[in-house]
UniProtKB/Swiss-Prot annotation:
Annotated keywords: Coiled coil, Nucleus, rRNA processing
Source organism per UniProt: Debaryomyces hansenii (strain ATCC 36239 / CBS 767 / BCRC 21394 / JCM 1990 / NBRC 0083 / IGC 2968) (Yeast)
Primary location recorded for the protein, binned into one broad class: nucleus
Coiled coil regions in record: 106-135
Location of the protein in the cell: Nucleus, Nucleolus
Region annotation (Disordered) ranges: 1-23, 44-157
Signal peptide: none
Protein name, per record: rRNA-processing protein FYV7
Gene from which this protein is expressed: FYV7
Lineage: Eukaryota, Fungi, Dikarya, Ascomycota, Saccharomycotina
């Protein structure tokens, strides 16, 4: 009878996003507090060191910073000099791009329609061949066997 569960408040798992954000904040605060206490301890001992990174992490961060610098510094040897384009030139280029993309879309639509049409004609032809009957009403076996052979050939390919 004393086994009743006590009221604990809001279930932390009802809103998972809120729970996760609280958990992340809690871990960040905990790490910051640990770091602060660590530096206080170092200061008391008289050692003034900057926080050291692992060799791998520092090498990666250096590589990233060098790549960032290289990518954002314009290199006059690799790039031709760009003169500012006026409005008419930019409009012309934009129009050409739009026309090119429109042509590509039209071509893909036409190709798709052609393939659909070919497949439907092929289906219709097969249907006609398979529905042929003898004089006595029995189905013709030749087209059916050919159909099965074609299916087997497709599976092999």
């Amino acid at each position: 009878m004393g086994d009743k569960k006590q009221f604990r408040g809001k279930n932390p798992y009802t809103d998972r996003r809120e729970f996760k954000s609280k958990e992340i904040k809690k871990s960040l605060v905990h790490r910051a507090r640990l770091r602060k206490n660590y530096f206080k301890l170092l200061e008391k001992e008289g050692i003034n060191h900057e926080p050291e990174q692992n060799g791998d992490e520092s090498a990666e961060s250096q590589n990233k910073s060098e790549e960032f610098k290289r990518s954002h510094i314009p290199d006059s040897r690799n790039q031709p000099s760009k003169r500012p384009m006026n409005f008419a030139e930019r409009a012309k280029i934009a129009k050409e791009r739009k026309e090119h993309s429109r042509q590509a879309k039209l071509k893909s639509i036409q190709d798709r329609r052609e393939t659909i049409e070919k497949k439907s004609k092929e289906r219709e032809r097969r249907k006609d061949n398979l529905s042929k009957k003898t004089k006595s009403g029995q189905p013709l076996m030749g087209p059916r066997i050919n159909n099965l052979l074609d299916k087997i050939k497709k599976d092999i390919e």
